């Protein structure tokens, strides 16, 4: 099981998966001892570099106010863009939207430029996948989100806009946390030579994250399983 996920699981997540697969109830301390005895260790996340955002055009208050829970799907969405470097020095940018109810990635887009269209495409995909959603939509103060055209998109679905305070990345904590997970469990483990190679790996990882990566806070389920369980209740 450890090799199946390329060594990304620590003892707590390994405990969830062992118990789920074997229908047992092993204590996490026992799994920790077993993993330690055979030198199994999870990959460690790297720290994120933060940048100062200047001269926004349209801003909003921090309506979310670090209330990182939601009672139902599509109640609160978080978004952000992160950067990847290819082996030849070129860059790629991933935009994603995370639902706070189940921590699922409801939409994402990968591009060669960090521009408005990347963010617009991500938002449009989320709306198409979740018709009728009117979420609280939280982001940082990046220029794509302070764009008047993006504000019009939010108004078009009657979404409430919320923004992190300047320099306070913790205001978007779960989104930042997802970037850390994705990079430590996928990106930092290998080199990517082409944009297409990176895109394939990201597609595979987000599918894994949404459908097979069990989370204790989701009652031991993967994000989409927890989401679907709520939708049919």
PLM regions and their residue ranges:
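An active-site-proximal beta-strand-loop segment
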Residues: 66, 70-106, 112-113
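Hydrophobic (often cysteine-bearing) scaffold residues that line and stabilize catalytic clefts
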Residues: 7-11, 27, 60, 74, ...
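Active-site beta-loop-alpha junctions of metal-dependent nucleic acid enzymes
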Residues: 90, 109-130
């Amino acid at each position: 099981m450890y090799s199946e996920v390329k060594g990304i699981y620590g003892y707590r997540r390994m405990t969830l998966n062992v118990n789920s697969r074997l229908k047992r109830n092993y204590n996490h301390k026992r799994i920790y001892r077993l993993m330690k005895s055979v030198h199994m260790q999870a990959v460690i996340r790297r720290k994120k570099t933060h940048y100062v955002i200047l001269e926004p055009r349209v801003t909003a208050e921090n309506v979310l106010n670090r209330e990182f829970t939601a009672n139902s799907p599509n109640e609160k969405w978080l978004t952000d863009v992160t950067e990847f470097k290819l082996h030849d020095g070129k860059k790629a940018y991933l935009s994603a939207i995370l639902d706070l109810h189940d921590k699922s990635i409801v939409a994402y887009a990968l591009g060669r430029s960090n521009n408005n269209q990347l963010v617009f495409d991500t938002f449009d995909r989320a709306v198409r996948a979740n018709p009728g959603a009117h979420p609280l939509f939280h982001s940082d103060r990046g220029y794509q989100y302070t764009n008047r055209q993006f504000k019009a998109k939010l108004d078009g679905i009657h979404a409430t806009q919320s923004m992190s305070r300047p320099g306070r990345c913790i205001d978007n904590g779960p989104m930042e946390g997802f970037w850390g997970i994705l990079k430590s469990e996928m990106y930092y483990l290998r080199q990517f030579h082409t944009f297409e190679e990176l895109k394939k790996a990201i597609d595979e990882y987000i599918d894994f994250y949404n459908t097979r990566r069990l989370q204790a806070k989701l009652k031991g389920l993967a994000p989409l399983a927890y989401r679907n369980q709520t939708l049919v209740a």
